[in-house]
């Protein structure tokens, strides 16, 4: 898993929230406009892969599949 994808998935633990809006997820990219575009693309990909769920109004949650993928990545 690439570093930016890991940061996006770890955002839920960082903010200690079950759901995050897109602007909070953009924080994973810092202040770099190119990174914000990359975060947007990553979020779309993670939704398609079932790792994030769209909750409406630009809010997203980490699915059980996403939690498992993140845990597996952290353990090697």
Where are these regions (language model features)?
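Amphipathic alpha-helical interaction segments
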Residues: 3, 7, 41, 61-64
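Short, low-complexity, charge-dense intrinsically disordered segments
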Residues: 73-76
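Short amphipathic alpha-helical interaction segments
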Residues: 32-48
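A short, conserved structural fragment
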Residues: 47-57
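Short amphipathic alpha-helical interface segments
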Residues: 1-31
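Accessory beta->alpha helical hairpin/"wing" motif in late/C-terminal subdomains of nucleic-acid enzymes
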Residues: 57-69
